[in-house]
A protein has these predicted regions:
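Multi-pass alpha-helical transmembrane bundles in non-GPCR membrane proteins
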Residues: 11-268
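Short, Lys/Arg-enriched N-terminal segments with co-localized hydrophobic residues
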Residues: 1-9
Length: 268
């Protein structure tokens, strides 16, 4: 009887060891399966994300995916614009001879500086990050600022009077509205509003082009040339192929330089 009891105990201990061993093996197997499934899901998610951005790169407010070299070129190109904006400010401050010219020059510089800074920073951040999506809003908003600030010396110093002031106020009310829409809805959801507004604001100078042609043909040609360069830059921008965004940046730089030369030589 005692021998039977001992044998049963031994069998029980053996069963417990086997159960524990089986439990450990099962636990390892489950953990391994979990990690494998998690890895597969992660890969599937990334593949789905890649397909989404490949087919619909601009369908929502996520930035399009570009190569590292492209983004370096984009950041450096408009980073150089920041330096040029500071140099431009130094030249303008040396030339201005009135309070209104000083104010107009500072507004003009602010628009140039903000646009090139926001653009350079936006293209510096890694794809998929929240900060990149945030700076994309800043980047698109700064286009409005550039247009309005470029007009500041023209409407305040060249046009002047009641018409110049009213024009300046109305234009900036539209600009603030556009920036607010980008802030609330993002840069892509209302493109059918923003792109026409960019165009209308940019070419609103037609209201006083006859005066420019009659009194300052050289100023007219510089401003017109800059506007044409900006518009030509929209071709690679809208195509949105490899390196095309970098080409768009070069057009923006050239357009800004050309119009600055006209404003510096014939207005300030």
């Amino acid at each position: 009887m005692e021998i039977l009891f001992i044998r049963n105990n031994m069998n029980d201990n053996k069963n417990k060891k086997e159960i524990k061993k089986e439990y450990r093996n099962k636990k390892k197997e489950l953990r391994k399966n979990y990690h494998n499934e998690k890895k597969e899901l992660h890969l599937e998610y990334n593949e789905e994300l890649d397909r989404y951005f490949e087919v619909q790169p601009n369908s929502n407010n996520n930035p399009p995916r570009r190569t590292v070299l492209e983004e370096i070129g984009n950041a450096v190109s408009h980073g150089s614009g920041v330096i040029l904006a500071v140099v431009a400010l130094v030249f303008m401050l040396k030339k201005v001879d009135s309070t209104i010219a000083l104010v107009a020059s500072l507004v003009y510089f602010s628009g140039l500086f903000i646009l090139f800074t926001m653009s350079a920073l936006y293209h510096s951040f890694s794809y998929g990050s929240k900060v990149k999506r945030l700076f994309r809003r800043f980047d698109y908003s700064s286009i409005y600022l550039l247009i309005g600030s470029t007009y500041a010396p023209i409407v305040l110093c060249y046009v002047g009077g009641k018409f110049g002031i009213i024009f300046f106020i109305v234009q900036w009310l539209i600009i603030i509205t556009g920036i607010t829409l980008i802030g609330v809805f993002g840069p892509n959801r209302l493109k059918y509003i923003h792109f026409p507004l960019y165009f209308i604001l940019g070419w609103s100078a037609i209201l006083f082009l006859p005066r420019m042609i009659r009194e300052d043909l050289n100023l007219f040609l510089w401003i017109l040339s800059g506007g044409i360069i900006y518009c030509l830059g929209m071709i690679p921008f809208l195509r949105d192929r490899k390196v095309s965004h970098f080409i768009w940046h070069i057009f923006v730089l050239l357009g800004a330089i050309v119009q600055w030369i006209g404003i510096y030589l014939y207005i300030l």
